[in-house]
Amino acid sequence: AGARLDCDVTLTHQRCIVDELCDLFTECGATRVDIKDLRDGSHSGYRAIHLHLRFPAGFAEVQVRTALQSHWANVYESAADIFGRHIRYLHEENCQGSLSPEEEIIVKLLHVLSKYISQVEKERDECSSVHPSDDLDYNMKHRQKITFELESDIQTTLDELEELFRKVRESRRK
């Protein structure tokens, strides 16, 4: 059993949500709650925080992702639907499966986007820690503007890849 929470929040708020959920699940009878933070040591680009829950009735998992982490993961799943599940393991030596040069470029682009997302989210987190009523210096205002623009560019690129994958799936149905 499991659930996924996709939230339009900063990294700090993502962690706060996880901490609140840990407390809530413990109050509700979880005998064990383990946190697995996949934001820095991603697996094939995937980033999130997972809660592994143990209850007397069994196990459950809750994934908490930011909006960008979620968008990336959904696009990557679409790529895996088209190119094959093995794309998750291309970094491993004995990975079975091959990609065309074009497919390989797209998968590598997704991995690069994941790294950019990580950097942009860290920057967004830092910029958002400044209280709006504080007198912002020019550099901070500039950083906030650039961070917003980069986030928007990443969203646009993910949207374009999503549309490309939709068209590929459509053409395969014909």
Feature names for model-found ranges:
Residues G58-K174:
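An acidic, glycine-/histidine-flanked metal-binding catalytic module
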